[in-house]
Each structure stands twice: as structure tokens, then as C-alpha cells.
């Protein structure tokens, strides 16, 4: 061959694997093996050099002056023969078979023999199995075996799913110290302190004799001043454990004082009056009618922790009069009006993907709908009413994302566009709207078990284009248009008493406004004040019955879709 050829190092991808396969064949045929591991009276021939290369435990055993250094047989204590077989297979093949049945033996054995690859595989498997019923046990198991990443993952999971976790036996069986550690944590994700209080009471009731004296110590970590006055008087005051304890009564009195003496709140600041930080909810605003007097495709995200707005990928079609919901880490944008016609199409964004992900289409509704109401119940999306360009609808349909299919349900009693749709205690409520002739104050509710709509007490004010959201046990209706004026007024419906009360008005009139709840507060988003499109956002605190303006969006709009999503 002519010319000068430079030398080159060439690495093959199969060499190491080929050697491992050959050594495994030698092991299985007991060829060139120079040590036998004995576990539970069962012998496992092996090669010292292979064991030492994979395990610091065996490396120390065979290279130091330990008694096992030159012995042909080594007894291994603290693990079973079946586990030893799995570990040896890993040493010679790089593959480990982890199951629910073997992981509790495999992980401690991997720690004992210092097989880092097996330990990591077990931790990854357990993390994939995290569930509200087992996360506390996995956290303790991880802590016992110094699996720091797994322990942190289990801890975060228990915080994120606190209301579900406390329903399971693992929580009830915790020690007082473990309960304290969990409920004092700022990061637990709850919509209010109600599930925290109820978790403490249920834990005490499980073993009343032994645990009753622990109640005052635990109750100091429940942020009772952040509970509603009604819950304090109706639920906490009625709890026998509370009435029987002077220390508990003092904590309840502190909460009442916080509500009754607002002028003293600045002096009462402390851990019990501080909102928890763990709720990673963000607010999403999609589409709407923009400042160019046309539908828009802009999507913005608000983080209440930083009070900052950022942009997400635009929807594929410009839409006003649009509805939006979130379900299982996905954002759905439903119906609307593109400037030419009312739409039945639905777009979806998988929020578990990167923020440069793309919107994709799912099955369209059976009916074209603009200004429809949308909500979620269980694993389903419900959409009712709306305007198709020629008539207002009484119909409601339901979307099942598992089969990507819409189905028609029972009709409302009144045709409505611009109505609000919300779920409370498993019942769907439709509020206000416009029937083609009149602005409505009527409210009807749908029972999914019977498939029927019935009327409930109407609102005090006729409203179309109002924002609707559930906070604690009240449905709040904000702003809208009454046929004459754009409204700033707000009223709240008590689902227990079927009655309405008026609360403090917003600082700005808002029609075609979005409403949702974030971290225990009600948000009113953008809208139209009768003169201008708005980018401003207001936040209502039900504890002090007061609104405050928070950071404005980058886009002025009304008729937008609004939803809340929990970030990972």
C-alpha cells in the first residue's frame, strides 16, 4: 500500500461484552474458578479477579490481609442463596432483574457487597413504584440503606401527594416524631390546612389512649389561622379532642383572634400564619381576543412563587371565546372562535415534555362551541353550552382521554353561552350566561350518577362572561356583564347551605374574565373593563376578604382560556 498511513487507536464496542460473556461461561462450567462463595449451604464458584473488579467489598477481601484472602471457600452471611445468584449474574452480565418480590432483599445485599450498579438499579425501580400507599415506607427503607436520592424522591412524593398519603395505613402507623416532621414541612402540597388538621385527628383517633396527649404538640404545626372561620367554628370547635384540651383551645383561640382582629395580624406573624410553599401550581392563560381586535394564539404562564410571567408555545389556531382545562399533566384548549367560525376542535400540550413541546390535536367535540363552559371531574373533561354561530346550546358532552372520544350527556334546562362551569363535591354547576334573549342569574347543577340537571338558588346578579372557580366550600363568581354594566362585583355560593353571599368587589370591572384558584387564593385574570382590554391580574384572599393586584401579563386580552397545572 502506497503513501504514509498515520497510526490510529481503534476501539471496538463488543470487546468488553465478549470478555464478560466468556467469563460467565467459564463460571457456569466451573472452569478457572479460584474461589467458592458459600451462602445458605449453597456453593457459587467464581473468579476472584472478576469479583474484586466489580465490588469494593471483594476487592478489600482478596487484596488485604483478611483471613479470607487465600481461602478457597468464603462464607457470606446476611443474604439468601437466591439473592446471591442474582448478584453474581449481575457481576458477570451487567444485568439485574429487579422485582417487587426481590427488591427488599436485593438492595440491602447490594449495599453489603458494595455493588453500586445493583444498588442504583434497585433505587430506580423503587422510585418508579412510588405511590401514596407506599412512599413513607420507601422513604424509611431508603434512609436505612443510605440511598439519599431515593429518600429525597420519596419525601418529595409524600409532600406532593399529602392528602392521598394520609389516607393510607403507613401514615397512621407513623410515630409522633415522623408525623411532626411531615406536617411541619413548608413543602407539603395542600389547597388548604383542612387535610392537615384532619390527618392529625385521624392519627390520634387510631390509638386514642396512647396518642391523645400528643395532640397539642402536633396541632401547633397545623396552620389554623389560614383556615376559614366557618371551618374553625363548624369543624374544629365541634371536635371532642379539641374541647377537652386547654392547650388545643389556646391554638384555636389564636386562629379566631387572627380572623376577628385583623389589625393585630402584623404582630401574629409566625410559622402558623405563613402559607406553605410546596404547591408547585402555575397559572396558564391561552388564546383570547387581543389588542389587534382579533383572536390570538399566545400562551402565558404565571408562577405565583416568583410572581413572574413567561411564554409557552403558541396554540396552532388563533382562538377567542375559548375554554381551557388541565388534566393529568396535559393542557386542553377547547372550541372557541377563530374569526371565521365557531370551532369543535381541541388541542393538547403534554406539559411533562420540555417547554418547546408542540400542541397536537385530539378528537373534536360533537358540537361547535364558542363561549362554552369546561371543567374536569375524575379522569374526564366536561363541556356544556356555548354558541355555534346560529344557536345557543343546552347540550353537554364528556371527553375520555383514554379512548380519545367525546360522548353526549343530558341537556341543561336552559341554553347558555358565556356561563361558568365548575365542579364541587362531585357535582357540576353551570352558572349564569346568556340564552340569546336575556342575561341569566340562574344556576343549575348536574349529578353524574343520575344524569339529570336541577336548579339551585340563583345568583343575586345577572352575569354573562363571568369568571367562576371553587375555593374551599364556596363557588365564587367574579365580574361579567349584566346587560348594562361591566361588573367588578363578586358573590360566593355555599354548596352546603344553597345560599349566596356578597364579598368584596374587585378593584377593576372585568367581563369575559378568567378565574381560578392558586395556593388557596382566587385569581381574576385579564378581561374587558368596558373601555379597554386588560392584562392585569387580581388575587382575592378569603381570609381577609380583600383583593390585591399582582404582576400583569405581557398580553392584553379577554375571552381567554384559563387553567392551573401542577409542575413536576
Swiss-Prot record:
GO terms for biological process: COPII vesicle coating; endoplasmic reticulum to Golgi vesicle-mediated transport; neural crest cell development; neural crest formation; proteasome-mediated ubiquitin-dependent protein catabolic process; protein monoubiquitination; Wnt signaling pathway. It comes from the Eukaryota. Residues 33-100 form the BTB domain. Keywords: Cytoplasmic vesicle, ER-Golgi transport, Kelch repeat, Repeat, Transport, Ubl conjugation, Ubl conjugation pathway, Wnt signaling pathway. Disulfide bonds: none annotated. Residues 405-568 are annotated as: Interaction with DVL3. Substrate-specific adapter of a BCR (BTB-CUL3-RBX1) E3 ubiquitin ligase complex that acts as a negative regulator of Wnt signaling pathway and ER-Golgi transport. The BCR(KLHL12) complex is involved in ER-Golgi transport by regulating the size of COPII coats, thereby playing a key role in collagen export, which is required for embryonic stem (ES) cells division: BCR(KLHL12) acts by mediating monoubiquitination of SEC31 (SEC31A or SEC31B). The BTB domain is required for interaction with CUL3. This is Kelch-like protein 12.
Amino acid at each position: 500500500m502506497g503513501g504514509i498511513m498515520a497510526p490510529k487507536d481503534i476501539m471496538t464496542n463488543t470487546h468488553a461484552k465478549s470478555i464478560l460473556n466468556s467469563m460467565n461461561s467459564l463460571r457456569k462450567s466451573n472452569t478457572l474458578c479460584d474461589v467458592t462463595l458459600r451462602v445458605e449451604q449453597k456453593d457459587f464458584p467464581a473468579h476472584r479477579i472478576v469479583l474484586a473488579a466489580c465490588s469494593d467489598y471483594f476487592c478489600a477481601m482478596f487484596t488485604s490481609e483478611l483471613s479470607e484472602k487465600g481461602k478457597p471457600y468464603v462464607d457470606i452471611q446476611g443474604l439468601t442463596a437466591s439473592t446471591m445468584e442474582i448478584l453474581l449474574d449481575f457481576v458477570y452480565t451487567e444485568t439485574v432483574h429487579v422485582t417487587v418480590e426481590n427488591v427488599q432483599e436485593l438492595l440491602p445485599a447490594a449495599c453489603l457487597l458494595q455493588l453500586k450498579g445493583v444498588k442504583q438499579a434497585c433505587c430506580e425501580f423503587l422510585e418508579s413504584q412510588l405511590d401514596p400507599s407506599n412512599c413513607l415506607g420507601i422513604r424509611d427503607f431508603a434512609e436505612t440503606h443510605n440511598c439519599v436520592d431515593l429518600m429525597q424522591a420519596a419525601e418529595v412524593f409524600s409532600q406532593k401527594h399529602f392528602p392521598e398519603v394520609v389516607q393510607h395505613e403507613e401514615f397512621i402507623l407513623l410515630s409522633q416524631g415522623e408525623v411532626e416532621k411531615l406536617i411541619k414541612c413548608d413543602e407539603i402540597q395542600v389547597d388548604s390546612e383542612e387535610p392537615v388538621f384532619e390527618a392529625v385527628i385521624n392519627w390520634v383517633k387510631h390509638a386514642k389512649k396512647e396518642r391523645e396527649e400528643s395532640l397539642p404538640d402536633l396541632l401547633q404545626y397545623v396552620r389554623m389561622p389560614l383556615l376559614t372561620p366557618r371551618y374553625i367554628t363548624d369543624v374544629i370547635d365541634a371536635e371532642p379532642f379539641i374541647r377537652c384540651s386547654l392547650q388545643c383551645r389556646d391554638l384555636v383561640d389564636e386562629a379566631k383572634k387572627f380572623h376577628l382582629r385583623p389589625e393585630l395580624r402584623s404582630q401574629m406573624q409566625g410559622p402558623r400564619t405563613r402559607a406553605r410553599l410546596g404547591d408547585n401550581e402555575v397559572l396558564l392563560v391561552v388564546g383570547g381576543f387581543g389588542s389587534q381586535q382579533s383572536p390570538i394564539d399566545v400562551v402565558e404562564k404565571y408562577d405565583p412563587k416568583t410572581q413572574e410571567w413567561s411564554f409557552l408555545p403558541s396554540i396552532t389556531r388563533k382562538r377567542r371565546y375559548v375554554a381551557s382545562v388541565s388534566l393529568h399533566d396535559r393542557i386542553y384548549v377547547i372550541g372557541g372562535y377563530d374569526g371565521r367560525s365557531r370551532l369543535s376542535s381541541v388541542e393538547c400540550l403534554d406539559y411533562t415534555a420540555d417547554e418547546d413541546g408542540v400542541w397536537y390535536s385530539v378528537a373534536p367535540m360533537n358540537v361547535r362551541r364558542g363561549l362554552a363552559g369546561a371543567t374536569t371531574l375524575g379522569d374526564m373533561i366536561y363541556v356544556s353550552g356555548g354558541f355555534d354561530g346560529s344557536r345557543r346550546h343546552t347540550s353537554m358532552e364528556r371527553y375520555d382521554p383514554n379512548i380519545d372520544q367525546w360522548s353526549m350527556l343530558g341537556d341543561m334546562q336552559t341554553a347558555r353561552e358565556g356561563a361558568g362551569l365548575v365542579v364541587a363535591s362531585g357535582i357540576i354547576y353551570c352558572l349564569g350566561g346568556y340564552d340569546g334573549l336575556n342575561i341569566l342569574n340562574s344556576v343549575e347543577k348536574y349529578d353524574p350518577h343520575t344524569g339529570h340537571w336541577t336548579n339551585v338558588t340563583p345568583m343575586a346578579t345577572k352575569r354573562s362572561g363571568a369568571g367562576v372557580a371553587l375555593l374551599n366550600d364556596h363557588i365564587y363568581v367574579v365580574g361579567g356583564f349584566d346587560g348594562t354594566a361591566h361588573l367588578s362585583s363578586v358573590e360566593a355560593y355555599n354548596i352546603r347551605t344553597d345560599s349566596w353571599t356578597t364579598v368584596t368587589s374587585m378593584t377593576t370591572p372585568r367581563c369575559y374574565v378568567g378565574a381560578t384558584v392558586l395556593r388557596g387564593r382566587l385569581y381574576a385574570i385579564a378581561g374587558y373593563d368596558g373601555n379597554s382590554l386588560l392584562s392585569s391580574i387580581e388575587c382575592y384572599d378569603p381570609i381577609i376578604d380583600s383583593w390585591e393586584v399582582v404582576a400583569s401579563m405581557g398580553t392584553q386580552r379577554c375571552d381567554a382560556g384559563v387553567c392551573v397545572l401542577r409542575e413536576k
